[in-house]
């Protein structure tokens, strides 16, 4: 029986893929499958992964599933992997990142003991530019939490939407898909999932189980490519607050701030930014829970834009 499936899209990671695969294989246990998705990579990343497994860990080959697709982005890669995943729970790993010790042991233990819908955990962050490792403290203490309105408010304000910071039951994920051809697909998907699973139990684990590699080649750090701009626009459309989902205003405001920031960085005219903001903020229904940014954006739009301009100037 497969308890956990971990999905790993692969694209142009020759420099990192062996470290990623080694971090998986040196702790792999029964009940786990690893789905490697070749997202049409033009280099030898997938071949390196296959060869490394075959030569050093042939006894684990039957726990790996290999998918080849034309280049369609990691959203489609994850969606295709979800269709064939056999695990009761689904985890994610980026192919330039790597697992920390006891990832599988700790998660399988929680899955067997707690029977929760979602598991959260912490990670380390390695900055390739600065050459240091730091902690990403998503979870403060080991506990079972109930996914209610108060919990979602805290979660939405934290804004830790990386797929690899959580494991989710497959029957929950099957009701959703990652949006294709956009960046920030995780931020577009996971807030919806947490509303859908209202009332479910979430186990929060303080342990650091993944190391995230922060590097210049990452898509979000490479200027403003079209998929990033599309993702921001889609986020603004998807998260207009409603009476059923008032906390969407937090996500909506985050996307709106990103949109205005990109307009400033791309040197669009002050008046185009001003009128865009005025037009959009009418969708925000303020209440005491919403941050000061929303208040500034709705009632002091010029001040809000000036703050963003100053922030970008001093970066």
Regions found by a protein language model. Give the residues of each.
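Conserved nucleotide-sugar donor-binding catalytic segment
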Residues: 149-225
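A conserved acidic beta->alpha catalytic loop
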Residues: 23, 38-48, 94
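Conserved donor NDP-sugar-binding/catalytic core segment of glycosyltransferases
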Residues: 102-136
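Catalytic core of nucleotide-sugar-dependent glycosyltransferases
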Residues: 208-215, 221-254, 259, 266-284
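Membrane-interface aromatic/basic loop that binds lipid-linked glycans or pyrophosphate carriers
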Residues: 266-315
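Glycine-rich, basic loop-to-helix element that forms the pyrophosphate-binding segment
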Residues: 69-85, 95
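Short, well-formed alpha-helical segments that are part of the catalytic scaffolds
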Residues: 13-26
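Short aromatic/hydrophobic "clamp" motif used to bind/position activated sugar donors
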Residues: 90
């Amino acid at each position: 029986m497969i308890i956990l499936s971990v999905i790993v899209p692969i694209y142009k990671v020759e420099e990192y893929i062996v470290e990623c695969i080694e971090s998986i294989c040196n702790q792999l246990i029964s009940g786990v499958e690893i789905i490697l998705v070749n997202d049409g990579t033009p280099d030898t990343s997938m071949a390196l992964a296959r060869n490394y497994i075959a030569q050093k860990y042939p006894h684990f080959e039957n726990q790996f599933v290999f998918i080849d697709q034309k280049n369609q982005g990691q959203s489609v890669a994850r969606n295709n992997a979800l269709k064939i995943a056999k695990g009761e729970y689904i985890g994610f790993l980026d192919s330039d990142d790597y697992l920390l010790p006891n990832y599988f042991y700790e998660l399988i233990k929680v899955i067997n003991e707690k029977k929760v819908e979602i598991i959260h955990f912490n990670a380390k962050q390695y900055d390739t530019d600065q050459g240091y490792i730091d902690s990403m403290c998503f979870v403060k203490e080991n506990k079972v939490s109930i996914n209610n309105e108060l919990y979602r408010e805290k979660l939405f304000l934290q804004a830790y939407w990386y797929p690899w910071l959580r494991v989710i039951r497959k029957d929950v994920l099957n009701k959703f898909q990652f949006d294709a051809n956009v960046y920030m697909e995780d931020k577009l998907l996971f807030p919806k999932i947490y509303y859908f699973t209202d009332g479910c139990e979430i186990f929060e684990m303080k342990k650091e189980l993944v190391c995230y590699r922060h590097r210049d080649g990452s898509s979000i750090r490479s200027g403003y490519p079209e998929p990033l701009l599309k993702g921001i626009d889609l986020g603004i459309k998807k998260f207009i607050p409603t009476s059923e989902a008032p906390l969407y205003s937090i996500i909506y405001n985050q996307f709106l701030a990103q949109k205005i920031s990109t307009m400033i960085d791309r040197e669009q005219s002050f008046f185009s930014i001003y009128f865009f903001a005025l037009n959009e903020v009418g969708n925000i229904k303020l209440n005491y829970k919403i941050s000061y940014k929303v208040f500034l954006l709705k009632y002091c739009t010029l001040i809000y834009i000036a703050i963003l301009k100053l922030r970008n100037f001093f970066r």
